[in-house]
Each structure stands twice: as structure tokens, then as C-alpha cells.
């Protein structure tokens, strides 16, 4: 037997064909969401408060300090928030201290700071009753970047940019004359020496002393001449910078100083963030810059005077490691003192080394490091600016390297916590202005923190982020896999990111650093391709937001691949050589071959085993979760694999799902971490279990109650239904499945079914990827799904009185009310079809709705018969089904409703949809198709043992698309069905062709895995042997029921009077420009005429045509289309007197907008009608009065008798 058995959870064993021992379990797949939010609550929020506070008033006599915060219990539970359309949020209370510096008085107070949305255990947020996800954003990391560009003469120039988290950009660039310029915040350029002089190093000698002698420096110094001898060089430089930043304003050295301090050195205006400081220190650090350079002067320990490195030594990695502590310490540190006129007058500490120029052995080049400022320094420092300039000048000498902006070492991820922190910071900085003003205006004696703090800017910023940010998305809840994928999605779009139109090819392309960090396969097709990605299965964020991936460390001494796991970011990985996970190992853990496949800085080739530093932990670490669910992925073309991964996310949950016979072993983990199943939180024993709840007695005696959700509507309108897996008496451990979620079976993801599939044509019905299906799949509910739709009706107060929910609806027969209760609301369990009443509702009729005769009646008899009109909620087109649930919310019951709403009724209708012609089906290899025919079971081809085939696919769908994985799955699936086993064939480490054929042989199938098929209609065998097997097929969300649409009489557009378009508007088919050409080509004048008139916007014509058809009369000639009248009116509005004449030169009257407005005219027959009506009403009133008198008399008589 090939393969070995592996247990997945407690309910499933699979025969696995993997050969590689997994040394690391998959991390929790939604930790990118949960960990980030937890970090935000633990310290992120505190940091934001500490960034903005303390706040002082303008005279610096009062100060508001932040003390701490506390998050209380949420107002609603998760379920209540869902039902009431509320947000699942917790109140946050912040303690502030207000200090009066004049009197020394301190007031401490706790201030309510709004309700903060709380993340659920599943990594989602409930906002206004809907489940949402905050997608992580992929952005350019703050730091310093160097780039090269070739001008039109083929000369290489360099550029550099310091990009902060917030604040001004600082750029350097060289031109064709080898002069170096700098730009501050995208303004006009100035020689870089001007900025150096402004920093307090004004003499040319000082500049040469700092940077050394290079052509770029010489040329720039020559260009930067002293123009105004009245000013010092520093003052002149400051004025020149001010002129660039604030053109047209009077320039003084003082204003320039304060402007530059505000732009670069004020932590409130300029922020590199921790990640920016880390990146700058890493880039400008002398250790990386000295690597493999020849040192030009001896390095001497400043404390002992010992020579650490002799001149002429090549600084290899081992040499640098040997003096690392000195390099991080005071080795070659030089302190420069700026002059008194400088922007910043503190001493500038630099590290300075001289190396031999790589391009010219006779020249010496100076390398300046920024002496590694502390992590807490969040602004750029003069040392950073000088070190950046040094790196820039070194590039021209062949030292250092330019950066690749698409490298994942230069792109980081902003997860939920950081995005939220940014919003709170935004709100707090808006609040800050407000607080300052209130502090200054009000009386200091009586001020308390509560009085000066207005929380509205903060709550508004948070609310806006959750409600309308591009990154706050309605959760994709088609099935558990789509939920999981959505939580792990990385988007380069959104505020502060890219835009679709400006994103070029390079940003979207697969980069070698994506390996193990971002999936190279799973990305949408269409305009977002490459901009929206998915985290790879083992991907993990470090504290700076860079994606790390795990590797096994290789001991270079012994050559043993250890089980020690090291997590590396993309730029750390660049320094090492990494072997692939499928490299063969000996028993002792050394490499079996002398030469192994590996990669170094994106070069995939064979490397000697003795230079390998790390090895991949798993073959599936390259791909995302959805991609890792495709068996035989390695045999599929990447474009089809992309479609396969994306289509699994569109699978509809079926009523009795089956896990695949041929899986990858990823199904269990995906189902477990998706959040759609019920998972045991603690060890214990089941004491009670039914369909709605499970009780587990913990080992310490306490009781856990798990509620099972039944047929809840998901965001996608599918049924979110959980099924209990445990029985009373079962022992459960933490992490075990208590109930399956939708699209799960026995704790494994189960998106579809395992039908028997044959690759053969049949009467041409599977032309162009169409799918032929057996009626068995319809009858046995194999591909049946339940869909729930929510409809709501609300009663409001109108000017004419309140609307009412009632059974008494005007002009509706008793038959239409048979399923309504006494309130007029449909009963649960009623079968409804389109047009049926769900909620009976009447609205008072307005004056404007009264006809002339009714108004006359009001005038004659006073305000008697105020009518109501029927505004009931009815079942829309194509939404028939069974009423699953009704929820009623009223103010009386204390439900929170919108203002003006008195009562809200929600009705849920469930539809059971069997598979039908027009539904879309797919396999896991991008092989999608539409059901074209459902054939009776008896007519389907059958196997020699009499088993009829379930599905027939076209064999032509395989060769050109190169997704051969489906054929291998087919054969292995048939073997698994015959042997009665489930199989796991992990990606890139699955069943080889030898495993496949040996399993086929074990199952007793023929050696070519094909079979003879018999025609179900004639019983004759088909001419050729056919590939028949079991393939996992899923039903996709694109169902014909949602798309089928027909219009009879429907709504028209107000202006053009043409029918609306689209199913949602109950619109018609657009007969467009090209279709008109087709009719013109045939000369079909009458058809054209009616399309342009009766069927479109000839208002009178269409009414008359309808009348003529119903009465069987000939159809009258059409009139003028409304859109023509619109054109005439537009031309008239331009002052052109345009009229329409007929063939006799008589003016054609166009419908006027005022027509039908003259409602005050009362015609004679109207009076007659009114008289009749009045007489009838008077008669009815008289009869009613008489009847009332009679009953009163009877009652009096009875009373007398009793006495």
C-alpha cells in the first residue's frame, strides 16, 4: 500500500501520500486579525493617547494629562447586536488629569469616551447588525530609499527619498552635470550643500571634511556660491530654503529656522514611527555598508588604543561579526558642533570610516553612519540627513545598493490595530484644538476634564472608519473558506495606498520575496489583479508589520538541518541561501545530496549543500489556504489554479455536504480556524446535546454551554447552519469540534460533493464547457442549497397620521389574507409566492391623492372619509419560498428604532434551490461550466456494473487549459471510492504518478484507469474506453434563479420615460445602438418603429396600444417619443425656437408637462357622480342611526325586565 494513514480530528482518517515530515504546525489562520486587535487594546490605544496628550492651553497655565483607560462590558451580546441591528461594542472610559500650573490644583476625572467596536473571537466586527472585516493594508514602509535612473544619454544618475509615516519628504537627486540637489516636500530643488550649511556646517572645508572629496561634492560646492556677503553662509542658506518653501513671503533666517524645525524635527508634525526608525538605522548603518569593502585606515579601539583591523583588510562578514560590539559602540565616532545660527544646535554624532573605492583602488571614499539613534527618536535627525547624503554620494562610487520598492522588505502591512490607532489619533488631534480653545475661554477655577473634552471628533472618526472606509468590508460569507480568505486578505488599495488606475505592472507582479509570505496564485482576475493578495499559509507579521516566514535552521558546522525554527523577513532572508522543503535528508538530518535546489536573493538554482543556511518548513508555505486546498496543484497551469482558488470561495453551502475523497489535508485546519464551526474552549465531558445547544462539564466542575446556530441568514443570503457532532457522554478536549458549520462534514471543509464524472461528449450538450448532469443529483438533493432572504416593513408617523400594520387592507380579498395573523403579519411556515402579502400595512391618504369629486364631497360634508392606501410588504419577483422567521420590533418593547419609526417587522423567507439548467458548477482546478441539460438517470451512460454516471464533462476542456490535475484527481478519486477511503495529497508533496497507479491497481481498476461505458438509451457500449472517476464538484453562487428575469409592465425613467434597466429595477431589455443597426440592415421599418415608440417612450401610444390589444381593435398609429420631446425642450432651453411639423406642415402638439395638472376644474359628470355618492352616504348614515336607536331601545327594555 502506497501512503500512510493520518488522523484529522476525531472523525476522519485519510491516507496521505506526503513524504516530507512537517516540523511546524500551521499557525492559527486568523491570528493576523486577532493578534493585531489585541495589541491595539493592550498598548496601541495607550500609545495614541500618549502621542497627543498632554495638551496645554495657549498661555501654558493649564495642562490636560492622560492617566489611563478602562474598557467595560459590552452593552449587547453578539446575538443581541445581530438581532437589533446594533454594533457589538464596549464603552471605554478614560481617566484624565487637569493641572492648573498657577494654583497647583489637580483634578482627576473619568470621562466616557464613546462605544468602541470589539472584535469577535472569529476576527470580525458587528457594525449595525452586519458582520464586517477590516482588511489589512499593504503599504510602502517609512524609511530611506535609493534609486537609479538612466537619462537619455545613457548616463546613470541616482535619487534618494526619506519617506516618513507622516510629514515632509526629503529628496536628493543628481543631474547630468553631476551636481547634487535636494528637494524638501516636492518643492523646487536647491544644491544639497545649502541644506548642509543650514544644519550648521557652513564652510566649504567643513563640507569636504564631512563627506570627503568626491566629484559630486566638488561640483555642488562650486555651484553653491556665496551671493550675499551681508549674511553668514548659514543664514543665506536658511533664507534660500525658506524662499523655496514659502515663495513670495518675506524671508528671514529666524522664520526659516522655525519652519524647518516644524517640518522635520517636531515630533507632532513629523513621525517616522518605530518602523521608519528601524529601516533608516538598518539602511544607514555602517555594518551593512562596510561588508566586503577594503578598509583604508586601521580601526582602533578608542578606549584601549588596540588596533582591531589593519588597513587594507577586506571586511568580510566574519571580520564585521568579530568587531560588531565596537561598531555598535563608539568606534570611529566623531562629534561635529554646528554653528550657532543652525536649525538644530545640538552636537551631531556620526560614525566615519574610510574605504578603498571599488571603482578606483587609488581613491579613498568616506562612509558616514548615523550612529544608530535610539528607537524612541521618531523624527529625522541631522545625523540621518548627513548619513543619507553620504550613502547617496557613495552610490556614484560603486558603494551601497539601490532599493527595489516592490521588495517585501520595503512594503509592510497595516493590520486592524494600526488602522484603528491611526483613526483614533486623527480624532484626538481634532479634539486637541477644541480642548485648547475651551481651556483658554473658560474660567480656570471651575474647569473639569469633563467640561473641556468633546468626544465627538473621536467617535465620529472611528464610526466613519468602520462604516465607510475602503478597508472596512462586508464579510464575504459564502462559505467558511471565503470567510477565512477574507480575513487573511492583503490590499494595496485604500487610503494611503495605491489606486487601481495608477498601479503599474511592477507593483502587481509576483516578486521573489512573496515566497512564503504572499500567495503567488490567489488574487482576483480583473482590474484588481496583483493589488489584492492573500497571506501565505505560514505567513506571520512581526512587530513592525513586515511579513515573516518560518525556516528550519541548518547548522553550518555539522551540516544538520535542525528543528529550530527561525522566522525571517524578506530583507533578512536576502542574506542567506535557503533550500527547498523537498530536499532529501539522511537519517541524521544532513542533506542526502551534495548539491540541492535552493534560492538566494531570488535566484533559483542548485547550490552546494555546505553553503545552505536554512530550509523551508513545508512545501505549502508558498501558497495561501484556498490554493493549498487544490489537490495536484503542481500539475495545473497557474492561471487555472488561480480560478480554482477563487471559485472555491464562491461555493454555496449544500444541505448535506461531503468532504472530498481526494483532499490535501488542509480541509481540517481551514474548517477549524474559519470561525464557522463550534469549537470546545476547554476539556470536559458532554452532559447534554441536542440540535440547539450542547453542554460540557469541565474538569473543574463548571459548565460550558455552546449554542448551535440553525438556519441563520449569512451575509451572502445562504443558510448559516451548524450541526451537532457530539453525543452525551463524549469526552472533548480543547480545540475539538462540537458542531460542524455550513459546508463542513465531520470537522472538515466540505464545499461540494463527490459525483461520478465521465469525460465524454453526449449529443453536443457539453459544448464549450457545459455540464451534463444526471437527474439523480436533483432528486436526491445532492446539490440542493437553502437560501434565506430578509424583507422588512416599518411604520412611520406621517403628516396625515401614523401608518398602521393591520389585517384590514382596502380592496384585498379574504383569500390574500388567509396566512396573516390578527395583526396582519404572515405566519411562520406559510408558503408564499410572488405578490403575496407578508405584512399588511396601510398609510393615510394625502389630500393630494383625492380626486375632484372626493374633494367636492369634503367641501360639502366636511372632513369625513379620510381614506387609507395599501402599502403592504409583498413578496418580490422570484422570491417565493417558506416563511422561516418573523421578528417584530416596537418602541413599546424598548427596542431602539430610527427616529420616526414606530414598528419594524422583519420577515425571513427560505428557498430550497435544487440544481437546475443554467446553474454554474466547477471543479477545484479552474474547470468551470454551466449546467446545460439534466438527463433522466435511465438515459445516462452506465458502468459495466450498472452504476450510472452522474456528470459528463467535455474532454476538450483539458488539453488547451493545461489543468491536468483534474484528470489525476478523477482516477485517484475512483480508486478511493472503490477502496472506501479518503485520501490526502498535499500540494507539492502529494501522490506521484507511481502512487497514483499503484492505488488504481490496489482498487482493482484497469491499468489505464479507463472503462467501457454503455449508452443508457440503447444499452450499446460506446466505441472507445472512457475516463470515468470521482471528481469533487462544487455548485457556485452564480445561480440561474438570481439571474432569470422577465418584464411585463414595469417602471419608467422619469425624464426620458423609457423603461429602466436591470433585474433590481424590474427593467427591460435594452435595444441598443448596434441592435438598431441590425434591424436597419434588414430594413425592418415597422419593427424599428414600434421599438422606438410603443415599446419604449411613446406615452400615449403605449397606453392606446394596450387598450387596443385588450379590446381586440387595430393598433393606432404611434405618436412622438418622449425622448424627442426632451431633445426639443433642451434646444428650446438654448433659445432655439424649435417646433415639429407633420407632412401637411401642421404643428404637432407635444405633451406638455403641465398637462393633467389642472385638477381644480370640476366637470358636469363629476358633479353627478358626487351627488350620487353623497346620497348613498346620507342613506347609509341614516340607516346606521336607526339601527343604533333600535339597539338602545332593546337594551333599555332588557334592563327594565331584569329590575
Swiss-Prot record:
Biased segments, Basic and acidic residues type: 1174-1195
Region (Disordered): 1174-1203
GO BP terms, alphabetized: DNA-templated transcription
CDD domains for the chain: RNA_pol_B_RPB2 (cd00653)
Gene3D superfamilies: 2.40.50.100, 2.40.50.150, 3.90.1100.10, DNA-directed RNA polymerase, beta subunit, external 1 domain, DNA-directed RNA polymerase, subunit 2, domain 6, RNA polymerase alpha subunit dimerisation domain, RNA polymerase Rpb2, domain 2
Family matches, as InterPro entries: DNA-dir_RNA_pol_bsu_ext_1_sf (IPR042107), DNA-dir_RNA_pol_bsu_external_1 (IPR019462), DNA-dir_RNA_pol_su2 (IPR015712), DNA-dir_RNAP_su2_dom (IPR007120), DNA-dir_RNAP_su2_hyb_sf (IPR037033), RNA_pol_bsu_bac (IPR010243), RNA_pol_bsu_CS (IPR007121), RNA_pol_bsu_protrusion (IPR007644)
Reaction(s) this enzyme catalyzes, per UniProt: RNA(n) + a ribonucleoside 5'-triphosphate = RNA(n+1) + diphosphate
GO cellular component: DNA-directed RNA polymerase complex
EC number assigned by the record: 2.7.7.6
Broad class of enzyme this protein falls into: transferase
Entry keyword set: DNA-directed RNA polymerase, Nucleotidyltransferase, Transcription, Transferase
One GO MF term attached to the UniProt entry: DNA-directed RNA polymerase activity
Similarity section: Belongs to the RNA polymerase beta chain family.
Main function: DNA-dependent RNA polymerase catalyzes the transcription of DNA into RNA using the four ribonucleoside triphosphates as substrates.
Alphabetical list of NCBIfam families matching this protein: PRK00405.1, rpoB
Subunit structure: The RNAP catalytic core consists of 2 alpha, 1 beta, 1 beta' and 1 omega subunit. When a sigma factor is associated with the core the holoenzyme is formed, which can initiate transcription.
Record's protein name: DNA-directed RNA polymerase subunit beta
Chain's gene name: rpoB
